[in-house]
Amino acid sequence: MEKYLVNTNTSLVEALKKIEVNNEKHVIVINKKGKAVGVMSDGDVRRAILKNIQLSSNISRIYNKKFFYFKEKELDKKKAIDHLIKNKMMFAPILNSKKEPV
């Protein structure tokens, strides 16, 4: 799971390295308490670079704070896959009741 997580103070270049290592084109952004506060994709990184945001900048201005997620307790795999396909989504994290990634 660690390869999918970055914190809000992570630099853009470090987040990009995680995206490259996990080979999934996204990361889940967590706060100091380990709760998910957003997601970030390789596309978000590209758009930041095109806006001349420095690679050393932290991701706080870049990641998506309004994100869709599945609740672990209510997860139905078929419905989840159908939702992703219907909404042309490549990814949505699964969070527990404390909003921690699982």
Where are these regions (language model features)?
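Short beta-to-alpha loop/turn elements within the nucleotide-binding domains of ABC transporters
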Residues: T10, M40, S57
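Bateman (tandem CBS) regulatory domains
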Residues: M1-Y4, S57-F67
